Amino acid sequence: MVLLAGALLLTLLPSCNKRPWSEQQRSYARDMLREWRNVVYLNELSEEEFALFSGRVADILEMRYPSYVEFAEMPMVGDSIEMVIVAAITSELKATPERLRHILSYDDLVELGTLPAGLTRHRQNGFYRCLAERINQTYGSIQSFVWDAMYSRLDSSLTTQMLHRCAAPFWDSELDITIIEE
């Protein structure tokens, strides 16, 4: 993906090394971010929210790298793009119940068997409150948590334990008692 990103960036090089990015280059940068659409958090955004997000990332890239040519020719350009994406995600997120829904959606947690189906919004909020508290206590920064989430290290990490501990109270164990009268 890094090589693809670099090759695609080089196709839109302007003739002047120091000109600001053209609208075509900015548009291309936003379109290139579509490759990241399936990443945790970004896959939960609506098309409008994603358009705003990719516009902000393109703005950050242009601000950090005013010369599109220098940016496109930079070694490891894909890593730079990735760092800006992570920084943009973490600047939007703090470990709060409302924002954790974008990283770990309720439907996904039900599908994984972490939470039971049919929880009320109030009970879902209780789960996300618990998880936000544990994340804030465990990880030094939300960025560390986002890195784990992006690179699918949640399965074998401390985060999985936190998920299960916070989910445990929501698994109601009901007993079916049948009274047989003789």
Predicted regions and their residues:
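Bacterial N-terminal signal peptides that target proteins for export
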Residues: 1-3
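Mature extracellular/luminal domains of secreted and GPI-anchored eukaryotic proteins, especially small
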Residues: 17-182
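Active-site acidic/histidine clusters and adjacent loop/turn architecture
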Residues: 8
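C-terminal motif of bacterial Sec signal peptides marking the signal peptidase cleavage site
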Residues: 12-15
